[in-house]
């Protein structure tokens, strides 16, 4: 996208992970070129809702932190000037560990207890423990972050008094509030027009606001339209990633193998700032308790500040990391007590009218037994598990060697997913709206700030208009810019299908009742305000509706390990889902299929980590996302539940597929693996260990 008179911008970044900025040494700039620093900020130097500086001042918190914006008409000239800019910074000792941190580095904490788990563990008996680690993951969206800021005149106003931002964002109103805050303007002077984007996996929820602020600052200083587009490599290095989680679990078991008490320690790497800190810590702690019942439990959670870029959501806000730990732990327990992991889960799963640990009651039937049996039936799980288990036990008495035959295993895991933010105060505005107008000419206009970020739902909304009002889908038009559309909140956590579609349906139903009694045009606006209860922290309210009707899923993964390369090859993935009322089954299957591919990448392919606060360039060059010829057979089936609620389902594969995969590899190797990504080197290390043990 470009406009007449547009200039370009690029970002000057910190070379150190932690320190103090002394000086930015810039060569003499040609005419029409500018270097913009935090001293040019007329408003507040932070994003709305989050403590993220727009441009660093004296304090430097991570390598790659934006220090200045270089602006000019020719991109190649900007790159040449940037190469001659030097940063004088005093380097300080940085923190990169979440397990050996200073107490002052804890951004957010949770201390949750139910019953007396310490006494339960003190009584002795069977105790099972594990340390479960999930590494970071890149969103790898098709287009890097970027923004175009266009100053304009309207009815005699000066050009710099109004601004339109074009950017690919899940949260247009957050962009507006952030830009108006940094410019020192009223919100109404900023219009955000979200551009169409494809699969983003929550990578476009808050970072576009930072890029938009940079472009807007440049437009304010120069009085010209400014386009700032990150290079793909730059985006990869400095944009948020799925945060790392380190979860330790220790459980004592009753005689029948059920969990008598659990003590869980959750440590999360949130990077330099606590973006969505409360939501991520709460959802991770909830996920770490899993889908099974604990007689008593204690959860100690910490979100830790380190000197890497701010970390954030990735296809959810921490449930997946928590569920990986819980589901691996449950499989470990089942293995320890000699039970089929599927049968153990069926005997210990949550039930209707029990509460989630945070206090939200489960109002619907909990269909875990049915889902486990459905996934098992699709995959022939029970027969395969028994067969592979016999082979595993036989190998214990044999010498480990390259016998030529592949080792096979099969794993199962379960999870649930809410639909919306758990924390009522996570965003400034929690009263979200949709507006629908039936025009005289037969057109139907839907106004929602979520539409552009959820373009794949357009046909769903068009079909609703056809079914309720008889409006031809071609006559449905969508408006999403913040100048006309109401605030519908961020497009994440399946809010588009569970909340916005419900509001839209209410608008359409109201118009149907009015259309033959009232003259056209007819406009109806519907809003929703969360029903809140007290959460784990007294001053933090949680949204009861977001998790009262969760979706549920079960995943089975079958693998075989090549006896020469030790690469695990996936023979099949089976997903059984209770998604409530499904509006478009074909689209729902596609959503789950895509999510399963990305979840598989996180589980076994996408090797990525920070080293001394930076991502080595090799990780970017060789980042290994699943290619089409690497995608195994994936089968999805939906449980026919007759539910009236529409439920989010897109995160379920991330929450149950990784644990099922690792369990399958664990059965094949007769070893309890506890981390992802899990690769051939990890398997090779265990293979050598097995050879040493068998030779004794």
Predicted regions and their residues:
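Cofactor-binding beta-sheet edge motifs in enzyme active sites
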Residues: 1-370, 377, 387-696
């Amino acid at each position: 996208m470009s406009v007449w008179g547009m200039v370009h911008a690029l970002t000057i970044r910190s070379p150190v992970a932690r320190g103090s900025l002394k000086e930015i040494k810039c060569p003499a700039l040609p005419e029409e070129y500018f270097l913009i620093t935090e001293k040019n900020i007329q408003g507040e130097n932070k994003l709305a809702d989050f403590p993220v500086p727009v441009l660093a001042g004296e304090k430097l918190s991570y390598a790659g932190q934006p220090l200045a914006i270089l602006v000019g008409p020719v991109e190649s000239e900007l790159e040449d000037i940037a190469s001659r800019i030097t940063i004088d910074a005093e380097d300080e000792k940085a923190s990169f560990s979440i397990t050996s941190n200073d107490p002052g580095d804890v951004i957010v904490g949770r201390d949750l207890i139910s019953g007396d788990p310490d006494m339960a563990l003190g009584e002795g008996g069977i105790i099972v423990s594990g340390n479960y680690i999930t590494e970071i993951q890149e969103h790898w969206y098709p287009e890097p972050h970027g923004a175009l800021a266009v100053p304009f005149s309207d009815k005699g106003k000066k050009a710099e008094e109004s601004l339109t931002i074009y950017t690919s964002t899940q949260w247009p109103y957050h962009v507006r509030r952030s830009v108006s805050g940094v410019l020192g303007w009223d919100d109404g002077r900023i219009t955000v027009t979200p551009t169409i984007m494809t699969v983003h996996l929550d990578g476009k929820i808050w970072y576009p606001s930072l890029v938009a602020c940079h472009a807007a600052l440049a437009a304010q200083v120069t009085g010209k339209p400014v386009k700032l587009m990150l290079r793909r490599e730059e985006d990869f290095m400095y944009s948020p990633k799925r945060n790392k989680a380190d979860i330790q679990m220790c459980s004592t078991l009753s005689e029948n193998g059920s969990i008598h008490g659990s003590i869980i320690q959750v440590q999360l790497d949130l990077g330099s700032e606590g973006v969505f800190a409360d939501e991520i810590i709460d959802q991770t702690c909830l996920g770490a308790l899993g889908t099974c019942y604990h007689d008593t439990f204690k959860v100690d959670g910490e979100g830790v500040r380190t000197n890497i870029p701010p970390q954030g959501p990735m296809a959810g806000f921490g449930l997946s990391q928590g569920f990986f730990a819980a589901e691996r732990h449950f499989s470990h327990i089942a293995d320890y007590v000699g039970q089929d992991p599927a049968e153990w889960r069926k005997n210990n799963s949550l039930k209707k009218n029990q509460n989630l640990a945070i206090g939200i009651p489960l109002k619907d039937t909990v269909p875990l037994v049915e889902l486990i049996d459905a996934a098992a039936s699709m995959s022939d799980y029970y027969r395969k598990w028994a067969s592979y288990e016999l082979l595993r036990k036989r190998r214990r008495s044999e010498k480990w060697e390259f016998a030529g035959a592949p080792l096979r295993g099969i794993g199962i895991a379960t999870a649930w997913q809410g639909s919306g933010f758990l924390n009522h105060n996570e965003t400034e505005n929690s009263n979200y709206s949709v507006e629908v107008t039936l025009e005289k000419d037969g057109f139907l206009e839907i106004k929602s700030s979520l539409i552009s970020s959820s373009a794949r739902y357009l046909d769903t909304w068009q079909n609703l208009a056809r079914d309720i009002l008889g409006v031809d889908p071609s006559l449905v038009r969508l408006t999403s810019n913040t100048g006309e559309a109401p605030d519908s909140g961020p497009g994440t956590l399946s809010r588009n299908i569970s909340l916005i579609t419900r509001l839209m349906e209410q608008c359409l139903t109201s118009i149907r009742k009015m259309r033959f009694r009232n003259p056209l045009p007819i406009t109806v606006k519907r809003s929703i305000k969360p029903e809140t209860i007290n959460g784990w922290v007294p001053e933090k309210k949680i949204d009861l509706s977001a998790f009262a009707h969760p979706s549920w899923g079960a995943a089975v993964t079958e693998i075989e390990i090549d006896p020469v390369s030790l690469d695990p090859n996936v023979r099949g993935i089976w997903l059984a889902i209770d998604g409530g009322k499904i509006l478009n089954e074909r689209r729902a299957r596609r959503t789950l299929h895509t999510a399963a591919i990305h979840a598989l990448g996180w589980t076994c392919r996408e090797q990525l980590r920070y080293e001394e606060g930076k991502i080595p360039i090799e990780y970017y060059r060789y980042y290994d996302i699943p290619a089409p010829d690497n995608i195994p057979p994936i089968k999805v089936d939906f449980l026919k539940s007759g539910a009236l609620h529409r439920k989010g389902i897109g995160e379920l594969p991330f929450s149950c597929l990784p644990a099922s995969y690792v369990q399958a590899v664990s059965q094949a190797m007769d070893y309890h693996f506890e981390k992802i990504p899990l690769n051939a080197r990890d398997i090779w290390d265990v293979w050598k260990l097995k050879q040493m043990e068998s030779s004794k």
